[in-house]
């Protein structure tokens, strides 16, 4: 089980709802992923009119927990306003907080992110901040009151996988009591498994499933990868070595096999 703000879930795979070829494929992919939490853009919901109503009906049919986000916000004020609107629309204090610094890389504005997180937490929000893998930023977010931190593996939609393994490993070691979710940059199920092998509590992805040739099958593949990665972490991975180490014992080896 994984805990998000005192709520427990069995699935460690969070999934986005954008970019799918059709609403039906989105539904089927979310079911195949076994996800219990889905991210939803406030801008999509409010700008869609009747389309937005239909989309919301599809989400309700899935019986999942909705995590609204502030995607596209570039300032603290814009992010805070969007979060408050999302709370009214979706009836939840949960918010995936994004404050973007650069349109090309979609890199978080970490200064604005910490400021916005502090404001929202004081206003009763449960904040899921999208950030870089910087330990200092993560610590500031925790100090502000975040019980969940969501560092990227790589830029959003890049599909590069984990580009700074050591930094993500350090975050896990230094923040043992914080729920950590790798968010963004994952492109293959193996990337998700690697994140879970590092001890991350969950992963969040969207494009890797939505843009796959078969999103439904890919969603199932990610589900299995997350389960495998978590099982491996809990089982205890052996440490990598610089030199070979025989797996077959030499005790009892016939003398004619001995090396002179």
Swiss-Prot record:
Pfam family, one: ThiG
Active site feature: 96
Residues at which 1-deoxy-D-xylulose 5-phosphate binds: 157, 184-185, 206-207
Keywords associated with the record: Cytoplasm, Schiff base, Thiamine biosynthesis, Transferase
GO molecular function, one term: thiazole synthase activity
SUPFAM superfamilies for the chain: ThiG-like
Gene Ontology biological-process entries: thiamine diphosphate biosynthetic process
Annotated catalysed reactions: [ThiS sulfur-carrier protein]-C-terminal-Gly-aminoethanethioate + 2-iminoacetate + 1-deoxy-D-xylulose 5-phosphate = [ThiS sulfur-carrier protein]-C-terminal Gly-Gly + 2-[(2R,5Z)-2-carboxy-4-methylthiazol-5(2H)-ylidene]ethyl phosphate + 2 H2O + H(+)
EC number, UniProt record: 2.8.1.10
Record's GO cellular component terms: cytoplasm
Biological or metabolic pathway of the protein: Cofactor biosynthesis; thiamine diphosphate biosynthesis
First-tier enzyme category under EC: transferase
Locations listed in the record: Cytoplasm
Protein family membership: Belongs to the ThiG family.
HAMAP family xref list: ThiG (MF_00443)
Function: Catalyzes the rearrangement of 1-deoxy-D-xylulose 5-phosphate (DXP) to produce the thiazole phosphate moiety of thiamine. Sulfur is provided by the thiocarboxylate moiety of the carrier protein ThiS. In vitro, sulfur can be provided by H(2)S.
Subunit-level organization: Homotetramer. Forms heterodimers with either ThiH or ThiS.
Protein name: Thiazole synthase
Source organism per UniProt: Nitrobacter winogradskyi (strain ATCC 25391 / DSM 10237 / CIP 104748 / NCIMB 11846 / Nb-255)
